Curated annotation (Swiss-Prot):
The keyword Membrane applies. Residues 1-27 form the signal peptide. PANTHER family: EXPANSIN-B15, EXPANSIN-B3. The lineage of its organism: Eukaryota, Viridiplantae, Streptophyta, Embryophyta, Tracheophyta. It comes from Oryza sativa subsp. japonica (Rice). May cause loosening and extension of plant cell walls by disrupting non-covalent bonding between cellulose microfibrils and matrix glucans. No enzymatic activity has been found. May be required for rapid internodal elongation in deepwater rice during submergence. It comes from the Eukaryota. Keywords: Cell wall, Cell wall biogenesis/degradation, Disulfide bond, Membrane, Secreted, Signal. Its main location: secreted. This is Expansin-B15. Residues 55-165 form the Expansin-like EG45 domain. GO terms for biological process: plant-type cell wall loosening; sexual reproduction.
Amino acid sequence: MASRFQLILSTFVVIAAVTMLPRPCASIEFHRKLSSWSNGGATWYGAANGAGSDGGACGYQGAVFQAPFSSMIAAGSPSIYKSGLGCGSCYQVKCTGNSACSGNPVTVVLTDECPGGPCLSEPVHFDLSGTAFGAMANPGQADQLRAAGVLQIQYNRVPCNWGGVKLTFVVDVGSNPNYFAVLVKYENGDGDLSGVELMQTGAGAAWTQMQQSWGAVWKLNAGSALQAPFSIRLTSSSGKTLVASNVIPSGWKPGMSYISTVNF
């Protein structure tokens, strides 16, 4: 009986040990799920050390050259530009398939649209500024990497972090007492917006939904004179909300920038 019991016990121990061994396929699948990198394509446009185009389809204008964007920008294929709703979103991009690639990720912000050519040939494509494309290279090999022209890359959506920079609202030059349009820039976190609302001052003031005009510009055609100061409520693409109270003052002027005291 004792020997039979020992045999059964030994068999149980062996089975238990085998069961507890890691399964290669399960382990690989687990790590694949943890990875947030996806495959895409990249080209570059504009000057070799420039910011792509002057402003781009999001409407940021000269801000693309200046800090905090600092020329590290991208024009996105339709799948990530999202008819302008992707403006301001941040991505890490890296390349490994060229000898000049460093393999280290760099962060870019979406400021423009790439509507045709290679941007339609694959699900996700980044047409990077020359500066951003070269930033993926090994030290001293930026020109060599740019000479490749087209790359397969890996990309990852990441939160935007503009340090101490606050939300900025640039009043569109076409605005008037009855029509108000504003460019929103430097949103931390999601970076892109799904909704913008305005509250004017006065009796019965309430939040009024603005409409996306184009790119990162939102508009409200009130049909009657709006009473400033205005508060603006932003909803990010993931549903987070933030209020910039009285950020647009009385006596606002078209073309002027107004900096809030808040950010996501």
